[in-house]
Amino acid sequence: MKKYSLILIFISIVIGVSFLPNVYGQDDISKAITKKNANPIVYHLTSNDPWRASIVISDATNLKNLGYNVTLLLSIEGVQVGVKNPHHHLNLDNVVANVTNFIKDGGKVVVCGVCLEVAGFEPNDIIEGAIIGTAEITPKLFTNATVVTY
C-alpha cells in the first residue's frame, strides 16, 4: 500500500510540474526584441546559377519574413539576378521575379556597380528598388553583419 501511495504522489508531482510555465522559453515579445537587436544578415550572391540563386533568395526571404534585417548583395556573376533583363541564355526569369518580390516585400538588394559594368549592364538596368553599391554603401553593409556567401 505504501508503494502505491509513493507512486501516486510521484505521478501527481510530475503532472503538477508539467503545468508550470517554462522559464527558459521565449514569449513573442522577447523573440521580437531578439530579432530587432540581432546583427544584420547579408546574403552575398556571386553566382548566376539559378539553383544557387534560388536557395539564397528563399533563405533571405524566409529570414526577412521572420523579422530579421536581411540584405541581398549581388556581385560578380550574381548581378545577373538583379537586372531587369539578364542574359537570356541563363534562364533567370523566375529568379529575377523572386528578387523583385523580395524587394516589393521590404527586402534590400545592393548590386555591385563595378560588377554590373563588367557584365555589360548600365545602372538603369537594375531592378526597381535595388541600389548600386558604392564605396560609401557597401562597407556599411558589413558592420556587425553575419555574411553568408554563395
Protein language model features and the residues they cover:
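Bacterial N-terminal signal peptides
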Residues: 8-18
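Positively charged n-region of N-terminal signal peptides that target proteins for export
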Residues: 1-4
